[in-house]
A protein has these predicted regions:
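C-terminal anion-handling pockets and recognition modules
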Residues: 5-8, 126-167
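Short, aromatic/basic amphipathic alpha-helical patches
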Residues: 99-109
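Mobile genetic element proteins and their domesticated derivatives, centered on retroelements
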Residues: 10-12, 49, 75, 92, ...
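Extended, low-complexity cationic-aromatic segments
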Residues: 1-76
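Short, basic/hydrophobic alpha-helical segments
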Residues: 70-88
Length: 167
């Protein structure tokens, strides 16, 4: 499989909010650090994407938590267009991922699904990509849903093939 690593697609989801900001900073000695931090209501979004060795694929932001119907819609609208025969879709053991409809759709493209063991997010390299995504989102400090979506779109373009290959 080492020679066929371009066939692997790691799928996962992560939460993003409009209150993401850096909680620490630096200032000159003797000066106080002043920065704005959100307070009050914020919007939560779910970001779903796949990681190949050459970049992020099928990114999708939704205004709801992940469930089976949303996962099936993600597979149909975002994932299927980027799948090739022989691809292996690797995902965590979330109950919403265990959809017969999604599995049939993936198999119809000649690909197949492989589930990670329970409670093992450290085996999914997309988690490292999500750490970078969230660090950039904190820097972007998006305070509206539209700004958050634009920031995510801009950040997805920052993932180089070399970087994704190293994950």
């Amino acid at each position: 499989m080492r020679e066929q690593r371009h066939r692997l697609i790691f799928i996962d989801e992560t939460g993003t909010t409009t209150k993401m900001t850096r909680l620490r900073g630096r200032a000159r000695k003797g000066e106080r650090l002043n920065a704005k931090a959100p307070f009050g209501h914020w919007g939560t979004q779910t970001f779903v994407a796949g990681l190949r060795c050459d970049g992020l694929v099928a990114p999708w932001v939704i205004d709801a938590p992940m469930n089976r119907a949303i996962f099936e819609a993600y597979v149909e609208t975002q994932l299927l267009p980027v799948l090739q025969p022989g691809d292996v879709v690797i995902l965590d053991n979330l109950s919403s991922h265990k959809s017969e409809t999604a599995e049939r759709a993936i198999r119809s493209k000649g690909a197949w699904m492989l589930f990670l063991p329970p409670y093992s997010p450290d085996l999914n390299p997309i988690e490292m990509a999500f750490a970078k995504l969230k660090a950039h989102l904190r820097s972007a400090a998006a305070r509206t849903i539209d700004a958050l979506w634009r920031a995510i779109g801009n950040i997805c373009a920052l993932f180089s093939p070399d970087e994704c290959s190293n994950y």
